[in-house]
A protein has these predicted regions:
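Conserved mid-core segment of classical short-chain dehydrogenase/reductases
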Residues: 46-51, 78, 99-107
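The beta1-alpha1 cofactor-binding region of Rossmann-like NAD(H)/NADP(H)-dependent oxidoreductases
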Residues: 48-51, 67-82
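Rossmann-fold scaffold of SDR-type NAD(P)-dependent oxidoreductases
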Residues: 11, 35, 69, 91-99
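Generic hydrophobic, amphipathic alpha-helix propensity
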Residues: 17, 50-53, 57
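A glycine-rich helix->loop->beta "capping" turn
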Residues: 3, 60-65, 83-96, 102-103
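Glycine/Thr-rich phosphate-binding loops of Rossmann-like dinucleotide-binding domains
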Residues: 18, 41-43, 104-105
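Canonical Rossmann dinucleotide-binding motif of NAD(H)/NADP(H)-dependent dehydrogenases/reductases
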Residues: 2-39
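N-terminal Rossmann-fold cofactor-binding loop
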Residues: 35-47, 71
Length: 107
């Protein structure tokens, strides 16, 4: 029986630690759902997108799947989890890296 790849969700994976963790998981053959809010360059003040990270995961040897998700919105998070369960049947790893970066003086 063939071993199934590990299924991971990495939140906040457009850049930084989330991106690095997602790519590292990909290098071990994982299926990685790369989540965040930045779909296109320019969506945030800093570079990086979920699609670019998903490509890097796939290039590293895994399967990268980009999913736009605002983790401050419970309905979007539920939809993400429902999708992963429907497509993969399980979640093996959750890396909860999503955060808001900004100037608190402007918040």
């Amino acid at each position: 029986m063939a071993q199934q790849p590990v299924v991971a969700i990495v939140t906040g994976a457009s850049r930084g630690a989330g991106r690095g963790i997602a790519v590292a998981l990909g290098s071990h053959g994982c299926t990685v759902y790369v989540t965040g809010r930045s779909e296109n360059e320019g969506d945030a003040e800093v570079p990086g997108t979920i699609h670019a990270t998903a490509r890097e995961v796939t290039e590293a040897g895994g399967q990268g799947i980009a999913v736009k998700c605002d983790h401050a919105d419970d309905a979007q998070v539920k939809a993400l989890v429902d999708r992963v369960i429907a497509e993969q049947g399980r979640i093996d790893i959750l890396v909860n890296n999503a955060c808001w970066q900004g100037n608190v003086m402007n918040a």
